């Protein structure tokens, strides 16, 4: 099933996008900082969410991992 129609898969994709963008911005800041607007600005916004809300994102990742491992 597509990640668009399955809510849990959609949450996984969003969490992975946030974590990946935050990690890439920590390695190469100029890569995401030059695209703050437009369609590519989504990646910059995801990186900002990952940096500023990192404890909440980490908790969500752990909860999602446990739900995938033990609930399915």
Curated annotation (Swiss-Prot):
Annotated keywords: Glycoprotein, Golgi apparatus, Membrane, Signal, Transmembrane, Transmembrane helix
Subcellular location: Golgi apparatus membrane
Cellular component GO terms, alphabetical: Golgi membrane
GO terms (BP aspect): intracellular transport; protein secretion
Keyword Transmembrane recorded: yes
Cytoplasmic-side segments: 72
Protein family according to the UniProt entry: Belongs to the KISH family.
Functional note: Involved in the early part of the secretory pathway.
Protein name: Protein kish-A
Species this chain originates from: Xenopus laevis
Gene name in the database record: tmem167a
